Each structure stands twice: as structure tokens, then as C-alpha cells.
Regions:
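Acetyl-CoA-dependent GNAT
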Residues: 10-14, 20-33, 38-111, 120-122, ...
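Charged catalytic carboxylate motif
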Residues: 18, 118, 145
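C-terminal "cap" of GNAT-fold acetyltransferases
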Residues: 65, 95-99, 133-147, 151-182
Length: 182
């Protein structure tokens, strides 16, 4: 992991199988301890299959980014990803042209190494280039690590909504940041 380079790039359709595995792995690392095995299995099966990832990659309303680690041998592995997209916006989210930060996950082994920051900074650059005035997201009310990370980037809580994981209805905080804030 040390000094080998990590690059952030736009995902390609050929990344879909690896992105599917990464999405499932990072979601499980983050939420397995807080949900039933049945609910996790159902959600992961519905959200992280290769065809869904491929559809998200080619969707013109979406930008899917991957963080790729390159070993000195030339071998590569996906270690994180992020997705921003336009679409339905909750009423609590301000702005005339908001974008959603749909997902931002990094493998636990890479936490604290700047990968999440690189992904977030790339998302902010893309959002600005698209004329976005507000970037918003939903984060589980009990995911304090993620909430702290988002606050460092100027996100504030603007509301909440339900997130259904299997049979469990959970509360996500809606957080947003004005893009004029730098």
C-alpha cells in the first residue's frame, strides 16, 4: 500500500465486475455489523451486480469515479469509488442546479491514506464544471465517521429521509454544501 500510486479516473464499462465486487465489499465493511445478514445480502444483491454498475457508468446523468492502486509490477486494483448524479432532489436541498453525491466508499485498508479526499476533490471539480450550485448526499444517521468527513468539506445537515435496507427502514441525514464555498 505504501508509496505505490493511486489514481482517480472515470470508470469504464470494463470496470463493472470489479466495481460490483468493490461496492459490495465496501458496503459490507461499513454496515455489516449494524444490519442482519439477510438484509445485507438482499441489499448487496440488488445494488451491486455488474449490470447495474455498467448501467450507472454509461448513464449520462451520472459520473462514476474509481480510485485505482497501481503496484510497481503494473498490477492494478480498485480501492475506492464515488458517484455523482443529477436526478430527483429532496425538497430540503437548496439550489437551482444540485447534484447528488450518491456514493463515496474506500476499502477500510485504505482509510486515512488520502483516497477519500482525492475522490471528493475530483467530485467537487466535476460538480463545478457542470455548473452545480449545491452538492448533496444522504448519510446514515449513525455513520459518524462519514458525517465528520463530509463536514470537513462544508456539508451541513438540511433534513432527513428514509433509506430501506432489506426489510429495515433506516434514517439517512440529508447533507448539502453550496458550491460557491470553494
Amino acid at each position: 500500500m505504501g508509496s505505490a500510486p493511486v489514481i482517480v479516473r472515470r470508470a469504464e464499462v470494463t470496470d463493472a465486475p470489479a466495481l460490483s465486487a468493490l461496492g459490495a465489499a465496501t458496503f459490507r465493511e461499513t454496515f455489516d455489523d449494524s444490519n442482519t445478514p439477510e438484509d445485507m445480502a438482499r441489499y448487496v444483491a440488488e445494488a451491486f451486480f455488474p449490470e447495474q454498475q455498467a448501467a450507472d457508468i454509461v448513464d449520462p446523468r451520472s459520473v462514476m469515479l474509481v480510485a485505482e492502486h497501481r503496484e510497481p509490477t503494473g498490477a492494478t486494483a480498485l480501492i475506492g469509488y464515488a458517484q455523482i448524479r443529477s436526478g430527483d432532489v429532496p425538497a430540503e436541498v437548496p439550489g437551482a442546479n444540485p447534484l447528488e453525491l450518491k456514493r463515496l466508499y474506500v476499502l477500510r485498508a485504505w482509510h486515512g491514506k488520502g483516497v477519500a479526499q482525492d475522490l471528493m476533490n475530483t467530485c467537487l471539480t466535476i460538480a463545478r464544471a457542470r455548473g452545480c450550485d449545491t452538492l448533496w448526499l444522504g448519510v446514515w444517521e449513525h455513520n459518524t465517521r462519514a458525517q465528520t468527513f463530509y463536514r470537513k468539506y462544508g456539508f451541513v445537515r438540511v433534513g432527513q429521509h428514509d433509506f430501506v435496507l432489506g426489510t429495515d427502514v433506516q434514517t439517512d441525514w440529508l447533507m448539502a454544501r453550496a458550491m460557491s464555498d470553494g
